[in-house]
Amino acid sequence: MKIRVPATSANLGPGFDSCGIALSAYLTINVLGESEFWEIQHTLGEEISTNEENLLIQTALKIAPELTPKVIRMVSDIPLARGLGSSSSVIVAGIELANRLAHLNLSPKEKVRLATEMEGHPDNVAPAILGDFVVASHVENQVYHVKHHFPMCDVIAFIPEEPLFTEKSRAVLPEKLAYKEAVAASSIANVMIAAILNGDLPLAGKMMEQDKWHETYRRSLVPHLKEIRRLTQQKGAYGSFLSGAGPTVLILSPEERTNEIVQSLEKLSTKASIQIFNIDQEGVQVF
């Protein structure tokens, strides 16, 4: 059995802790057979556990404690600690692993609820499960979500060499916003979502760059965002935003502008990689 989970990008600027998209980079796990102990085979680095302490197994055992140990191969081309949903992909894979091995027949809604409870917010896990563009809310232990088609475009990722861990990126956020500022932030997010639903990426991109919830406070941690935004605006991008907690910046681009934008970004920094993604429309898949 093979389980594949897409990378994700949360927030899209003003859709803080609510909006997310699935991307065409993947975590893949293969169940190879029975074993006396849980064993995870991977080449992802020493910091990733190879036994039952791995987040994949921890997640699966929370859902189905009776699971018997397996040998599992884990492969991922999702960069770690770069704001592309690497940990969320493992949680989603763990839920699907338990679902299949224990024959739980979980619905997509149940998977989103379980993943949100474990992750704390739905903006990454929901698109990882459902694919495409998802707007979600986690209020009073209830999870509400809507999936919709995201307009066609290229998604260019500017991925710095240095990681930025979510805990550090969240620590700079304020505990409160002034009421007037919160109203403005909410209205910007509303217009962004409506523009996406209408297929209007030029307007959606403008709203993505007007966020008031988090990007302002994270600028000191992601100094490259301002220059990327200036450069990509000049080259005809729809818009750019900090992916999740950063440090990756995503740029939405018309296909005909992508090569020129990528060339400009490559000149900007040698301490970053540039990748081009598509929107993954399927979410978690089992083969």
From Swiss-Prot:
Protein name per UniProt: Homoserine kinase
Residues spanning the signal sequence: none
Domain of life: Bacteria
Lineage: Bacteria, Bacillati, Bacillota, Bacilli, Lactobacillales
Matches recorded under PANTHER family: HOMOSERINE KINASE, HOMOSERINE/4-DIPHOSPHOCYTIDYL-2-C-METHYL-D-ERYTHRITOL KINASE
InterPro entries assigned: GHMP_kinase_C_dom, GHMP_kinase_C_sf, GHMP_kinase_N_dom, GHMP_knse_ATP-bd_CS, Homoserine_kinase, Ribosomal_Su5_D2-typ_SF, Ribsml_uS5_D2-typ_fold_subgr
Subcellular location(s) per record: Cytoplasm
EC number: 2.7.1.39
Principal location: cytoplasm
UniProt function note: Catalyzes the ATP-dependent phosphorylation of L-homoserine to L-homoserine phosphate.
GO cellular component terms, A-Z: cytoplasm
Pathway field: Amino-acid biosynthesis; L-threonine biosynthesis; L-threonine from L-aspartate: step 4/5
Alphabetic keyword roster: Amino-acid biosynthesis, ATP-binding, Cytoplasm, Kinase, Nucleotide-binding, Threonine biosynthesis, Transferase
Gene3D superfamilies noted in UniProt: 3.30.230.10, GHMP kinase, C-terminal domain (3.30.70.890)
Family per similarity comment: Belongs to the GHMP kinase family. Homoserine kinase subfamily.
SUPFAM superfamilies (alphabetical): GHMP Kinase, C-terminal domain (SSF55060), Ribosomal protein S5 domain 2-like (SSF54211)
Binding positions (ATP): 79-89
Molecular-function GO term, any one: homoserine kinase activity
Source organism per UniProt: Enterococcus faecalis (strain ATCC 700802 / V583)
Biological processes per GO annotation: threonine biosynthetic process
Reaction catalysed by this enzyme: L-homoserine + ATP = O-phospho-L-homoserine + ADP + H(+)
